[in-house]
Amino acid sequence: MLMLIFINGILLPQDQAKVSVLDRGFLYGDGVFETLRAYSGTIFHCNDHLDRLFQSAEAIYITIPFTPDHLKKSLYKTLEANHLKDAYLRLSVTRGVSEPGLDIGGCPSPTLTIIAKGFSGYPDSLYQSGIHAAVVNTRRIPASALNPAVKSLNFLNNIMARVEATRLNAAEAVMLNMEGYVAEGTVSNIFMVKDGLVKTPPLSAGILNGVTRSIVIDLLKENGIPVIEQAFYPDELYTADECFVTSTLYEVMPVTFINGSAVGSGQPGKLTQMILNLFRRLTAGKKSY
């Protein structure tokens, strides 16, 4: 059965789901998106993702002609039409179709697409062994050039960092900001643990305010684990006891090697495993969200 894709209010089979070559999302990466996760038919922290989508759109002067509730219903409609319970969903909003050119005045209405695909998570073996990461040369675009709070369709900065990481046999890149501080991964936020203290870059480091990042910070505080948002240089990662990255799809993923050097024992740390277990209690519905 072909995947059904939601385009501007209509569900279409994958082979019929088309967007104009004059769409500014295609021409310029001019738009915003969110990646969401469904567990047992419930979209996790859906409202938080939609809030960020609307904030991103507003920041680049795109007016979404629907309410958050309407988009939420559209997400569930797409999920159910594809008979999915455990899935990831990609919600994209472009500025719409216009004649080529940078002027945004000729766009009558945005283009809205939703893709839902079955996803039950990464293999358990990855969480048991951890992933390799690499500090790369590609720097995070500074906030003065592009607001990091905007989850933009133009992902070239992240793609080039991931290319570097892949060439270094790493699954994720550690991107630095222009001041040389640790910023974030290509699709994740970064946390390190040293002597029982959890540290993660602050939003002022030029990072996206990840939904999973916020949940993890709250979980740490609720469970009496000290956590600070503080800038740090990559050298601290090499001497950390533990390291992990967070994202909608990663959840809480241990990082056990950075540029070929073991983090701590080279195995997922106890605190990382505890946070992953607490997070999965949320996704399993054992605590309200």
Positions of predicted regions on the chain:
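Conserved alpha/beta cores of soluble small-molecule-handling proteins
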Residues: 1-174, 178-181, 208, 217-289
